[in-house]
């Protein structure tokens, strides 16, 4: 009744925009990591080839020991090309032209060529004893250091190096493949729910990046933070969410009906049970035999206080002897996403499950 009409179909236009955006490469390539092409293999070994986009006139041969750092600089005019013949590094780089640019990490393995664009700060953290060739076009004179070839820019210190050496994940958690591709980087971020007591209090920052495994299509974070740091005192309680509570009430009713669960005999385990939000509906329905497994001490204590029996610890092989087995139903909500040991967790679940369990 307003006399207003859309000139175009809104739903169709939104669909077209999404399709168009999906085809755009929004990632600015600051650094390329390339594998060799035209591989030739025989009983003597392997030959691979790398094509360079510009001529070079100098080659530097560099050996570096595990646990050391190189670079911490940028090149104002030249690309830097490094061909790795042995070892492995974590490369950290950042666009110095853009003040909002995140600090990004990338693994480079033996046989790969790393190309860093001009005005990109970068640092190499050597995770293995490593040998590489520095392929230079132009000057490499130390008298020219800081003018056109290399400008010092320290943005990775020993503390950050040690943190990366400790928690970086080089292989797929699912299949073990080491050829992981970075999909997105949000820079370095504090841990979730990491509430500070003082306004200017410092906290540890970790790369928040997603890597993709081309072999099994698993997506995972580039680092694995010590679970004790994350879960020893977990601040989020699931029962504060009405949506969560209603979801688990409906789930308990559904499982009871579809699986024909016996309220007196059925044994139910919930992995990563938080404050017992998924088990409480079963207790309310009259089930007697339930157990939560929760690594956060404060949440396990809260659940036990509320009469929801909970084991405080991680689901891992060494803890199985402390947990009653032969469960008829095992629950796990958003649990694998929080674990670095996917296979061990799955193995533990099968060991806890009864022969005909679900």
Language-model features, listed with the residues they occupy:
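A short, N-terminal "cap"/entry segment at the start of jelly-roll beta-barrel domains
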Residues: 2-57, 71, 162-163
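Double-stranded beta-helix
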Residues: 29, 102, 123-164
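Conserved short histidine dyad/triad with adjacent acidic residue
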Residues: 60-77
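Glycine- and acidic-residue-biased ligand/ion/polar-headgroup-sensing regions
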Residues: 77-96
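Short acidic-glycine-tyrosine-enriched beta hairpin
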Residues: 96-118
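N-terminal juxtadomain amphipathic helix
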Residues: 167-243
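A conserved beta-strand element that flanks and buttresses the S-adenosyl-L-methionine
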Residues: 331
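A short glycine-rich, Lys/Arg-flanked "PGG" loop and its adjoining helix->strand segment in the class I
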Residues: 343-358
